[in-house]
């Protein structure tokens, strides 16, 4: 018993911050938005901006198990879609490849763009694909700045970088708007997600057709809906061509497992870029196509990878091939949905938005529903979710969700129900003060024609999302308005962990344990959204914000120290081939070079590409429509080591190299460092010697 007690106390020690942490007071001034001029013509603009940070940021999602990013493979983006209905209403729909949105980022972005664009706080949503290989130390609360990654505290430089990049993206989309047409739609797709918490899902009162004995049940108990808002704009010759899609699919971006070492967009990268490249090629658009694919109700939706069972004492291997296959399947479904909407495009656009900002600890009742005033972490959070467990802790019954030891059997009548508090009920607040938890929700509704988007800062389970959507749709129906598509955008404008139904909560799986505000969270959120929907239909404008946007947050530094480089860029190791040795691995060609340090490398700018020698000329390479550069799928850039004179060693890996050509790596200019070229090389799969090493040529 004492050993178990010590283990639980050690577990709760992960909630501790060093006493010397610096607290920063941050104030964001609420702007006065400009008036949006009525032009009578719907307009739109869209842009993709890079938000890949320097090496060294802790990656979020896997908490203390996560690595710090050594570099990237598939860049992190913020995709912005600006839409104006011509009647004085506009929205900025922002999808990011981050683990979660941030209310602080949303506030800073609103403050940066409102006076120029007229966009109000209710008009801007910042969603996240929920990649578990992206930075997260940008929240307005200490709790998730401590516990969502392996680093503790707000990283001010990343906060400023992400906020500024998103604001710049909104401004660029706004300034490049063109006459627009819009279409909305839905397609149900199967075989891409599965329910990872089936034993909770079947407890829902309205679920009668799912059996735990059915091996296919986990593929049926899902949200299959892919939603999409397609936008075309007019080119210089008066022809309408595709510009963007803002879409949603419910799936955890955890196709890549815990040991991954570089920033990435997980399976979303493939689903996003496949559509962008395919549509741009087909329609020969004079602008880059933007596919802002975000997440929906992915709380209990795992990627439908091969099921290897649970992991108790270790992590599964990183499998990029499996992530790519699944992501490209989703991408093909998105392309088909996009194309099917061609005949639905209309220049008649109606935009309505509403927002109500609430401190839910201070405003924890609505009608007869009372939310917990004090949040609490359940014991199952320590052991993690199915397939992505915390090794060894998952072997402790009290910590592994879903079993009889992980939930309380006495004193279960309160708002936290049968949750067993991690570290015990009365000790947890000593390690984690309740004031450190997130408390402010921006309830928001965005209506574009017959589609209603409901952004929420929660990971919402499938059935929870259905109940919220029904509540909001019913409110609109009472006013004679038929909403065809109603969908939750999870992880948006902040992060609060999970929300399950009351029935699912009783099982106390990971999702229920991570429902901080208790068993009535979903009824409370549904009621608040329903009230907002009612007010949206009865009031001219609903925009209710807190009186001030002020935060006191513990800060830390993960960005590299700013050191001016004084050395000279040079090659270190010429291209060499590394063969895959396991089923989950890929062949790659590696090149190493000396370059400016981490503070100057600017990973958010293009850095590496592959060129092929064709008819005596070096041409930037493409393979089956995919550019072979660091904006594609197969180039990975990583920092190997710091060196003297402010310099650092880097490596680029070209995974899945194409046989039969003559190639070279090209490193883009940085500061005063000139463009750098590797020696040329070939790759041949039919020559044993050539597959063990690249053959270099001196030009």
Predicted regions and their residues:
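Bacterial N-terminal signal peptides
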Residues: 8-16
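Bacterial N-terminal signal peptides that target proteins for export
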Residues: 1-9
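Non-catalytic substrate/cofactor recognition surfaces at enzyme active-site rims
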Residues: 21-699
């Amino acid at each position: 018993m004492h050993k178990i007690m010590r283990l639980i106390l050690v577990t709760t020690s992960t909630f501790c911050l060093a006493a010397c942490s610096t607290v920063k007071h941050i104030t964001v001034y609420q702007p006065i938005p400009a008036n949006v001029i009525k032009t009578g013509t719907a307009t739109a603009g869209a842009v993709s901006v890079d938000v890949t940070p320097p090496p060294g940021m802790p990656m979020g999602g896997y908490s203390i198990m996560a690595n710090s990013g050594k570099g990237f493979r598939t860049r992190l983006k913020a995709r912005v879609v600006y839409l104006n209905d011509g009647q004085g209403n506009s929205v900025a729909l922002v999808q990011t490849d981050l683990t979660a949105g941030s209310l602080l980022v949303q506030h800073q972005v609103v403050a940066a763009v409102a006076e120029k664009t007229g966009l109000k706080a209710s008009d801007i949503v910042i969603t996240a694909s929920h990649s578990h290989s992206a930075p997260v130390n940008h929240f307005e609360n200490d709790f998730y700045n401590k516990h969502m990654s392996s680093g503790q505290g707000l990283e001010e430089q990343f906060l400023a970088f992400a906020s500024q990049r998103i604001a710049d993206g909104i401004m660029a989309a706004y300034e490049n708007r063109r006459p627009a047409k819009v279409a909305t739609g839905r397609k149900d797709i199967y075989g891409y997600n599965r329910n990872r918490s089936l034993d909770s899902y079947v407890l829902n009162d309205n679920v009668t057709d799912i059996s735990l004995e059915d091996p296919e049940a986990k593929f049926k108990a899902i949200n299959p809906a892919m939603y999409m808002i397609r936008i075309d704009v007019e080119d210089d010759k008066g022809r309408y061509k595709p510009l963007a899609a803002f879409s949603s699919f419910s799936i955890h971006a955890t196709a890549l497992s815990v040991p991954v070492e570089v920033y990435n967009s997980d399976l979303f990268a493939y689903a996003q870029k496949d559509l962008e490249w395919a549509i741009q090629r087909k329609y020969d658009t004079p602008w880059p196509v933007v596919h802002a694919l975000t997440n929906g109700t992915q709380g209990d939706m795992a990627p439908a990878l091969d099921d290897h069972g649970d992991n108790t004492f270790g992590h599964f291997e990183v499998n990029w091939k499996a992530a790519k296959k699944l992501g490209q399947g989703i991408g093909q479904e998105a392309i088909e949905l996009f194309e099917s909407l061609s005949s639905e495009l209309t220049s008649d656009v109606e935009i309505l938005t509403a927002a109500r900002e609430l401190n839910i600890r201070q405003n924890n009742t609505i009608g007869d529903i009372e939310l917990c005033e004090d949040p609490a972490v359940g014991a199952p959070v320590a052991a993690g979710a199915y397939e992505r467990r915390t090794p060894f802790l998952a072997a402790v019954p009290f910590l592994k969700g879903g079993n009889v030891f992980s939930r309380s059997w006495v004193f279960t009548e309160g708002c936290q129900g049968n949750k067993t508090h991690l570290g015990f009920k009365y000790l947890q607040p000593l390690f984690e003060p309740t004031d450190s938890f997130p408390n402010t929700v921006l309830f928001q509704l965005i209506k574009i024609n017959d589609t209603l988007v409901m952004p929420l800062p929660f990971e919402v389970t499938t059935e929870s999302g259905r109940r919220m959507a029904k509540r909001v749709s019913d409110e609109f129906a009472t006013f004679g308005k038929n909403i065809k598509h109603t969908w939750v955008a999870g992880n948006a404008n902040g992060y609060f962990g999970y929300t399950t139904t009351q029935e699912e909560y009783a099982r106390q799986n990971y999702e229920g344990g991570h429902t901080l505000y208790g068993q009535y969270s979903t009824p409370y959120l549904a009621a608040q959204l329903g009230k907002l929907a009612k007010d949206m239909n009865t009031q001219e404008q609903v925009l209710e914000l807190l009186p001030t946007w002020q935060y006191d947050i513990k800060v830390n530094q993960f960005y590299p120290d700013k050191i001016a480089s004084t050395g000279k860029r040079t090659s270190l190791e010429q291209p060499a081939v590394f063969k895959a040795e396991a089923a989950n691995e890929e062949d790659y060609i590696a090149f190493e070079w000396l370059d400016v340090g981490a503070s100057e490398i600017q990973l958010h700018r293009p850095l590496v590409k592959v060129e092929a020698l064709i008819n005596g000329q070096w041409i930037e390479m493409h393979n089956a429509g995919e550019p072979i550069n660091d904006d594609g799928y197969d180039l990975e850039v990583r920092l190997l080591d710091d060196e003297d004179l402010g310099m650092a060693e880097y490596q680029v890996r070209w995974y899945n190299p194409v046989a039969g050509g003559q190639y070279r790596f090209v490193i883009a200019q940085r500061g005063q460092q000139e463009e750098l070229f590797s020696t040329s090389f070939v790759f041949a799969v039919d020559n044993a010697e050539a597959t063990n090493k690249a053959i270099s040529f001196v030009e």
